[in-house]
Amino acid sequence: MSMNGDGYLDTDEALRLLDLGIRNGALLDMAMSIDNRGTPIEGESPRTYADGKARMELLGYDVHAGLRIAPGASTASLSLSHLHVVRQSDAATASIASLLRNQTVGLTITVSIYRSGGTDTAQAEPMIEFVFTGGRVNEVAYLTGGSSGHPCEIVRFGYRVMSINSAPQLATGIRGAVRTCDLTAS
């Protein structure tokens, strides 16, 4: 996916990101939570999660990590992209816009991916979880289009640290041993 590099999403870029969420349908088993210093941003997800925290359903996400080597340098530095999430607009839309307007910093954004196929059991734990700390909302795009036609939004988050937790997930929804990696941009 190429971005034009000006730091802002134009409509064509937003429509390409919207494709992240609509290729496999709107009922993927992904969720996001946004914690604003202990206060969760609540959407309309009726699902109950193992940790009891409120989450918002996600249609898709995009984040990159890579090494960049400056000319003449002997070691590479770690580069982290912004986090883009694609979601259907809901009750949390105005709350997320308020985080942008107020330039709120210090958010914790958690993206959870479940393999168990959308089970409604509260014991389901994610097979992959991305936790972004030191976050802020940098941009929001509101649009319809693509094959979904539903009101959607793309939220671009900046952050300081990305933690990745992955584990095998059993058919019951419980996960096995967790592997962890923390990435901090240098």
Language-model-derived ranges and their functions:
Residues M1-S186:
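Glycine-rich, low-complexity intrinsically disordered segments
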